[in-house]
């Protein structure tokens, strides 16, 4: 069945994807050059759904292997608004998006973390890589406060 996909067909290299993500994590700056103002990055990564609602309240999860509870939407990214409700490891305020063939990235500003996962699994729910990847990444962190 046909459908409109505004983000469909985007292509990048892993290196360019990382450069873009690092620029976002650094508040719009990369290699000493400002591409976006910090305010623009803040606006992009804030939940803009009406009334602060979540994706779970407004849509169905057609392609994502993870649910949308505790997740809002910014200007181009899903945004975690309630990490407990999302039932995914992460932080409130982390932002992410996935693509075709199970590609996925997320940025966690609180942990100064970027994760980019490029694979080719179709359909996207062939294997639950997003949940498992997040679990593995966050479980590898050491508690430096102990």
Features from the language model and the residues they span:
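Catalytic loop of the DD-peptidase/beta-lactamase superfamily, centered on the K-T-G motif
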Residues: 1-146
């Amino acid at each position: 069945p046909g459908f409109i996909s505004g983000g469909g067909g985007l292509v990048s290299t892993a290196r360019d994807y990382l450069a873009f993500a690092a620029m976002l994590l650094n508040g719009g700056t990369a290699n000493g050059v400002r591409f976006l103002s910090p305010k623009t990055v803040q606006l992009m990564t804030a939940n803009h759904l009406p009334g602060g609602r979540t994706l779970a309240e407004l849509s169905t999860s057609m392609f994502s292997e993870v649910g949308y509870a505790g997740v809002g939407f910014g200007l181009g990214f899903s945004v975690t608004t309630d990490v407990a409700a999302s039932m995914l490891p992460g932080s409130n305020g982390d932002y992410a998006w996935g693509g075709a063939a199970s590609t996925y990235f997320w940025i966690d500003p609180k942990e100064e973390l970027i994760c980019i996962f490029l694979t080719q699994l179709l359909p996207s729910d062939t294997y639950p890589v997003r949940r498992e990847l997040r679990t593995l990444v966050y479980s590898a962190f050491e508690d430096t406060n102990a």
